[in-house]
A protein has these predicted regions:
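A short beta-strand element within the Helicase C-terminal
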Residues: 110-123, 150-156
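Short, low-complexity, polar/charged sequence segments that are solvent-exposed and flexible
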Residues: 62-65, 85-89, 118-121, 141-144, ...
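Conserved Helicase C-terminal RecA-like lobe
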Residues: 1-98, 104-106, 110
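Alpha-helical recognition domains of nuclear gene-regulatory proteins
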Residues: 30-33, 58, 82, 117, ...
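Short amphipathic alpha-helical segments
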Residues: 55-57, 110-114, 136-137, 167-168
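Acidic beta-strand-to-loop metal/phosphate-binding motif
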Residues: 100-101, 120
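A conserved SF2-helicase RecA2
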Residues: 127-173
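Conserved beta-strand elements of beta-rich interaction domains across eukaryotes
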Residues: 49-50, 73, 105-107, 117, ...
Length: 173
């Protein structure tokens, strides 16, 4: 965690960072490197649907197929099927190793034990007990009966920003 904590602040000539900004550019870079191994499956959590939409669009622009669990039951089941089984609603094979979920409404009740990596895009700005509960619920989508792979959890924070202040407040009290 500490190693990943200041990723957004590192000086870099990476064109992704120039185009998308530090956090989103670095997230795309990390996801790309993880997907070199086709067995890796990634869950991205955010508190805001707009952020997840932006991430999804940016990943797609960079050739990374992804799904966003939102909408009606059919849309949600379609996104889950693509991620878990690599099959769309018409039975076609698809390559979709990234799924995005809102921490507000999509984390509970969803089983995603195929995941190998989880990203929290920003710290949760709530009281500590609530943050712990929300994170445990989110991680529990992948870390449950049926999980056979090692699961890595990463938090993306930008150094010297309100994000770092929130993270420090939650982890020092």
């Amino acid at each position: 965690l500490e190693k990943k904590k200041d990723l957004c602040q590192e000086p870099d000539e990476n064109p992704l960072i120039k185009k998308y900004g530090a956090k989103l550019g670095r997230l795309i870079q990390i996801i790309r490197s993880l997907l070199v191994n086709e067995e890796n499956k990634i869950i991205v959590f955010s508190q805001w649907d707009n952020m997840l939409s932006l991430i999804g669009k940016s990943l797609a622009e960079n050739g990374i197929d992804n799904s966003f669990i939102k909408g009606n039951v059919h849309a949600r089941n379609s996104a889950i099927s693509k991620f878990r089984f690599g099959i769309d609603t018409k039975g076609n094979n698809v390559k979709n190793n990234v799924i995005m979920l809102s921490l507000k409404n999509a984390a509970s009740g969803t089983t995603l034990t195929e995941a190998t990596h989880i990203f929290f895009v920003e710290p949760i700005n709530q009281i500590k007990a609530e943050c712990i509960a929300i994170e445990h619920q989110a991680i529990g989508r992948a870390c449950r009966i049926g999980q056979t792979k090692e699961l890595t959890v990463m938090r993306l924070l930008c150094k010297d920003t309100i994000e770092e202040e929130i993270y420090n407040r939650l982890n020092t009290s």
